[in-house]
Amino acid sequence: LRLDFEDGYGNRPDDEEDRDAAQVAALLPALLADPHGPFLAGIRFKSLERPTRRRGLRTLDLVVSGMLAAGPLPAGFLVTLPKVTSVDQVTAMVAVCQELERVHDLPDGTLRFEIQIETTQAILGAGGTATVAGMIGAAGSRCIALHYGTFDYSAACGVAASQQSLAHPVADHAKAVMQVAAAGTGVRLS
């Protein structure tokens, strides 16, 4: 389960998103402690692209800080890194996780994430390489999953909205590249 601060949430005034991040920080520990709840839960924050980077990182910090203010970070907490366009963004996400761990005195490797594949650049780089394989490598043990974003990826490929689905050939291609990139790494596909 991911509580969405990205496309589904939209752009809100900072004070409103701050309040919502605080509410999510209060909700997640109880949700993850519930034996009938999800085994993984967290947030999808705004991307690391320049227009949304500051807001996304602030939301991530507020959620992590808020949960830690109430107690230990719950097992099963996970964040989704959306709209990744380059290996550099994954490297930056690793640095963000390391800094949050340092600031909050958490053991190295505590914070984990999934990479949401919803841009064409994440599948095929300008040099013809499968960028997603480099993303997995850059994340190291922090990346536990790749998540395919059907609608954004299909739109980026020029697929009409009425034709966007997991069954479209562009989705088949992207998912096949993701599967090959993740093979043998322990990174799961979702």
Regions found by a protein language model. Give the residues of each.
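Conserved alpha/beta-domain cores
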Residues: 1-190
